[in-house]
A protein has these predicted regions:
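Cap/insert and terminal regions of metallo-dependent hydrolase folds
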Residues: 1-2, 75-79, 104-177
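Flexible, acidic/histidine-containing loops and adjacent segments that form or flank the divalent-metal
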Residues: 1-109, 113-114, 173-177
């Protein structure tokens, strides 16, 4: 059911036809590296893997912790998004795909859906961020926005209800963050 089984079939097909694949290593800062002439940029460039498949970096070494009990496949694919922080000199950029801020109190174990607060705590302040999940209802909670304090927020809208008014209010209200 849903997107994940089809994606897994696609990934397996791709691997069987020569595509090199590897697991996203939560906490790593060495998985994505510069290929051409990296030495001059070694101290100024980093991509840190913050979260993926139900795990969030702890902020220490390459250690991560699981965000929810049970099978991560029980949640939709959005909850399994990968999140990164890119640093280049003083510029920092955050992208968390479709991660959630857990703004669904009526759902069972809603607290397990709040990846944003934990990711925000380890990410820290950024210059630019991409709004999680197109700025939908369950994203960009106040704790997350305060932790990142971005100067610019990019919203990748793909339908007429992206972003939603409540998320825009959180993003634009200086009293929220």
């Amino acid at each position: 059911k849903g997107f994940m089984p089809e994606y897994i079939r696609f990934a397996q097909y791709s691997a069987n036809h020569g595509t090199q694949m590897e697991k996203f290593e939560v906490g790593s800062k060495n998985q994505f590296t510069l290929v051409h002439n990296p030495k001059p940029y070694a101290k100024n460039f980093e991509i840190r893997n913050l979260a993926s498949a139900g795990e969030v970096w702890t902020g220490k070494g390459n250690k991560s912790r699981k965000m929810y009990s049970g099978d991560p496949m029980l949640f939709d694919e959005n909850m399994n998004s990968c999140a990164i922080r890119l640093r280049y000199g003083k510029f920092t950029y955050y992208n968390g795909g479709d991660l959630s801020g857990g703004n669904w109190p009526e759902l069972y174990k809603s607290h397990e859906r709040d990846f944003e607060t934990q990711v925000g705590n380890v990410c820290g302040k950024v210059t630019v961020m991409k709004a999680n999940h197109h700025g939908y209802y369950e994203t960009c909670n106040a704790r997350f926005l305060e932790a990142l304090s971005p100067q610019v927020i990019i919203i990748d809208a793909r339908s007429k209800n992206h972003p939603v008014p409540s998320t825009m209010t959180r993003m634009s209200d200086p009293q929220v963050w």
